[in-house]
A protein has these predicted regions:
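Metal-dependent amide/peptide-bond hydrolase catalytic core
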Residues: 118-215
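Short glycine/proline-enriched turns and hinge-like loops at secondary-structure junctions
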Residues: 1, 112-114, 188-191
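Short coil/turn motifs at secondary-structure junctions
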Residues: 14-18, 78-80, 126, 202-204
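Acidic/His- and Gly-rich active-site-bordering loop/insert found
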Residues: 1-41, 62-67
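Fold-level recognition of mixed alpha/beta catalytic cores in primary-metabolism enzymes, strongest
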Residues: 38, 43-152
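Catalytic metal-binding/acid-base residues of hydrolase active sites
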Residues: 14, 23, 80, 105, ...
Length: 215
């Protein structure tokens, strides 16, 4: 710590679900080292980044070097679902003049980043027996039309917004549907579908504007 400008080294310890473990060449929880590389869930995103931050602090300590400003190391949870861990640190007053997010970037500086909002869509239908499906309204068929509109909406937003530093201008703020649930029985017209997803927010765009456009 010191009176100069402060710096945060930030990384997360949570990971997304592993999926079917039989599709992995090694157990996602093994941390097995093969040809000098460690394999396992979160080894790249982002235990490696956390390790590099801790090692940087260790080097400073080994050299008995004291920076002019405070250096804060943050190991947080909840990054994969909105950043609640980092937000908790901010609310508690752990802020600084600058921050380095230790995410994997193929050793390239990334001075800008898009944001994201999560959403849930509920699509109503009208249930009836499959033999009389024309008397009902399939929520699944309604959702298929909505999904096509979401894809077109994503393209439209990338045509409107122009962002610096991105090599692929059409991949800045993607929209993804991550889960879909619906229907009760194979012989019943689906009376509802629930879809959950992620809405990309462009750098410099407010959450409010992104939500308004999506709605």
């Amino acid at each position: 710590s010191g009176s100069g400008k402060s710096l945060i080294l930030n990384g997360h310890v949570d990971v997304v679900p592993v999926g079917p473990e039989d599709l992995w060449s090694e157990s996602p929880w093994s941390a097995k080292i093969v040809d000098g590389k460690l394999y396992g869930r979160g080894s790249c995103d982002m235990k490696a980044g956390l390790a590099s931050g801790l090692y940087a602090l260790k080097i400073l300590k080994d050299l008995n070097f004291k920076p002019n400003g405070t250096v804060i190391f943050q190991s947080v949870v909840g990054e994969e679902s909105g950043g609640c861990g980092t937000l908790a640190n901010i609310i508690k007053g752990y802020t600084a003049d600058g921050a380095i997010i230790l995410e994997p970037t193929s050793l390239r500086l990334s001075p800008i980043q898009s944001g994201a909002l999560t959403f849930r869509l509920t699509i109503p239908g009208k249930a009836t027996h499959a033999s009389m499906r024309w008397d009902g309204v399939s929520a699944i068929e309604k959702y298929s039309l909505l999904h096509s509109s979401i894809i077109e909406f994503e393209k439209h937003r990338h045509d409107v917004y122009d962002v610096e530093f991105y090599a692929s201008k059409e991949r800045v703020a993607p929209i993804n549907i991550g889960t879909i649930t619906g229907g009760q029985w194979h012989s019943t017209v689906a009376e509802s579908v629930i879809a959950e997803g992620r809405l990309g927010v462009f750098p410099g765009e407010s959450n409010e504007n992104a939500r308004k456009e999506f709605e």
